[in-house]
Every structure is written in structure tokens, then in C-alpha cells.
Amino acid sequence: EIVLTQSPAITAASLGQKVTITCSASSSVSYMHWYQQKSGTSPKPWIYEISKLASGVPARFSGSGSGTSYSLTISSMEAEDAAIYYCQQWNYPLITFGAGTKLELKR
């Protein structure tokens, strides 16, 4: 089983601040996907196949990485970006998720 470790577990950013969330895999994976979850809702696909934005995701989000190291970046934090973000990989037949990164708005 491939273990995904996210960093940081919790972070806070001010409006306009750049935010980077990292996801480290215990062994190499071909693709990494990211989900956004807001309170009381199910996780939504956010970034797929490393860097492709899901429909409706703002262009301030981007994804990058390869091998065992991947990241999600927000170029300029907005209030609506406060959420929990999960990385996810599929190494047939097992799907594994990171424990999540809680992103809060720093006021």
C-alpha cells in the first residue's frame, strides 16, 4: 500500500497570500489527484492527473510534481479557499488518500 503524507496538517493564510500544500508518497506514483472538502459537504474533485483543474476550479489553483513528491498551490488566497484538501492516488487495485490539510483564513 502506498502511504500519502501531507504537509502541513493545518495552515492559515491571509487574503492574497500564496499557499502550497505538499503530498509525499511512500513510493513512486504516476498520477496524483486532489480534492477539496468544505464543512458539511462531500469532497469535490479539484485537481486531477497532477495538474488538470476540475470544472469550475479557479485558475489561481495549480498542481505539480512527479514520482513521490506532489503539490497543490494557490497563487493568491481567497476566503472561499478555506477548506480541507486531500491528495489521492490510485495504484491498482488500491486507492489511498492523504490525511488532509486544513487551510484556514488568517484574519
Curated annotation (Swiss-Prot):
<keyword id="KW-1280">Immunoglobulin</keyword>
<keyword id="KW-1015">Disulfide bond</keyword>
<feature type="region of interest" description="Framework-2">
    <location>
        <begin position="34"/>
        <end position="48"/>
    </location>
</feature>
<dbReference type="InterPro" id="IPR036179">
    <property type="entry name" value="Ig-like_dom_sf"/>
</dbReference>
<dbReference type="InterPro" id="IPR013106">
    <property type="entry name" value="Ig_V-set"/>
</dbReference>
<feature type="region of interest" description="Framework-1">
    <location>
        <begin position="1"/>
        <end position="23"/>
    </location>
</feature>
<protein>
    <recommendedName>
        <fullName>Ig kappa chain V-VI region TEPC 601/TEPC 191</fullName>
    </recommendedName>
</protein>
<keyword id="KW-0391">Immunity</keyword>
<feature type="region of interest" description="Complementarity-determining-3">
    <location>
        <begin position="88"/>
        <end position="96"/>
    </location>
</feature>
<dbReference type="InterPro" id="IPR013783">
    <property type="entry name" value="Ig-like_fold"/>
</dbReference>
<feature type="region of interest" description="Framework-4">
    <location>
        <begin position="97"/>
        <end position="106"/>
    </location>
</feature>
<feature type="disulfide bond">
    <location>
        <begin position="23"/>
        <end position="87"/>
    </location>
</feature>
<feature type="region of interest" description="Complementarity-determining-1">
    <location>
        <begin position="24"/>
        <end position="33"/>
    </location>
</feature>
<dbReference type="InterPro" id="IPR050150">
    <property type="entry name" value="IgV_Light_Chain"/>
</dbReference>
<dbReference type="GO" id="GO:0002250">
    <property type="term" value="P:adaptive immune response"/>
</dbReference>
<dbReference type="InterPro" id="IPR007110">
    <property type="entry name" value="Ig-like_dom"/>
</dbReference>
<dbReference type="Pfam" id="PF07686">
    <property type="entry name" value="V-set"/>
</dbReference>
<feature type="region of interest" description="Framework-3">
    <location>
        <begin position="56"/>
        <end position="87"/>
    </location>
</feature>
<feature type="region of interest" description="Complementarity-determining-2">
    <location>
        <begin position="49"/>
        <end position="55"/>
    </location>
</feature>
<dbReference type="InterPro" id="IPR003599">
    <property type="entry name" value="Ig_sub"/>
</dbReference>
<dbReference type="GO" id="GO:0019814">
    <property type="term" value="C:immunoglobulin complex"/>
</dbReference>
<dbReference type="GO" id="GO:0006955">
    <property type="term" value="P:immune response"/>
</dbReference>
<keyword id="KW-1064">Adaptive immunity</keyword>
